[in-house]
Amino acid sequence: MGIWVRTPDLGQSENVVWNRAANRTQSSGRAVGGRLYLTRERLLFEPNRVDAITGGSNWQAPLGHIAGVSRESPDGQAFSGGLRARLRLDLADGSVELFVVNHLDEVIRTIRQATGHPV
């Protein structure tokens, strides 16, 4: 989708319906800059090209595997995005993904609508 962040690999019938700049908490000491993409099937994260070269990972989850969408309070971890409230995704396998995004409440509403969770 751009020079800074590569276009996500999509299925043949898949289209991006929404996207937003985001930082993904990849570990307790690292947040990776990039972009969140929403399709009618999945939520995906693509790291920016610099973070991808230095070990930043892409991520994806089918919408049906997102069990919860909420706000994670700041935890004080400066290098993993923990100085701000973050988007929290609880997944069906019990894992948690955290993302720093602007307009957090709007993002939560958008993803809740897409996953069929109460807005």
What does each of the following model-derived ranges do?
Residues I111:
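Short, well-ordered, aromatic-rich surface patches in folded extracellular/luminal domains
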Residues V50-I53, G68-A85:
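Short acidic, Gly/Pro-enriched loop/turn segments at secondary-structure junctions
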Residues F45, A52, E97, V107-I108:
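Eukaryotic short linear interaction motifs
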Residues P47-R49, L89-D93:
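Short acidic, glycine-rich loop/turn motifs
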Residues M1-E41, S57-W59, S80-L83, D90-A92, ...:
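Anionic N-terminal interaction surfaces
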